[in-house]
């Protein structure tokens, strides 16, 4: 049936994209570990980037996702555009995966006198306080979240986020309440 073929092509395309993303992350983590990561920093317009990521996830999600983008026009981040897209996509992907059937994701950005703050806030299942200290470790996964949502993975995503933001001279922090929300805050310096 033609509909089945179209769906199979879509699934194959999605899986190829996932494999490419994972490969890129492994390569970049290896470069970071060796001290060889080259960042090509530039001023990246944040609002259009957040909007593009939101649209991508709304199109491909099987869940009902509501996005709220809270970012002034003209807000920018001095960062490697590819890396910034990858880490924000990773955080949104986690927000979608570790949520119930309907989720609100708030993407926000704000310029400060010290740099730019970017937040990804979701109304998902949250992260138990007892496991929050482990989530940025390589190959670490929060067991309770995987069991609740049936998701799988390698536990590289949040370590990747931390390493890339750190390579930019920034910081990452998480605030979460189990059963309620998670919020990841990325702080990037001015230059």
PLM region spans:
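Conserved catalytic submotifs in the C-terminal HATPase_c
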Residues: 40-44, 66-75
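Conserved micro-motifs of the catalytic ATP-binding
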Residues: 34-39, 76-79
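Glycine-rich ATP-lid/hinge loop adjacent to the conserved G-boxes
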Residues: 140-152
């Amino acid at each position: 049936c033609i509909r089945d073929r179209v769906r199979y092509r879509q699934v194959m395309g999605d899986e190829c994209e996932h494999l490419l993303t994972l490969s890129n992350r492994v390569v970049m983590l290896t470069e970071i570990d060796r001290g060889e990561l080259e960042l090509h920093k530039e001023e990246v317009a944040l609002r259009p980037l957040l909007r593009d990521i939101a649209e991508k996830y709304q199109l491909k999600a099987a869940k009902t996702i509501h996005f709220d983008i809270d970012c002034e026009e003209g807000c920018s981040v001095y960062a490697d555009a590819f890396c910034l897209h990858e880490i924000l996509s990773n955080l949104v992907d986690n927000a979608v995966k570790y949520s119930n059937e309907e989720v609100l994701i708030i993407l926000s950005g704000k310029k400060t006198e010290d740099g730019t703050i970017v937040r990804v806030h979701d109304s998902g299942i949250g992260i138990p306080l007892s496991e929050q200290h482990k989530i940025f470790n390589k190959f670490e996964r929060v067991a309770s979240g995987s069991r609740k949502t049936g998701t799988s993975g390698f536990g590289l995503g949040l370590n990747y986020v931390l390493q890339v933001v750190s390579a930019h001279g920034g910081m990452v922090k998480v605030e979460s309440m189990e059963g309620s929300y998670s919020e990841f805050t990325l702080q990037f310096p001015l230059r």
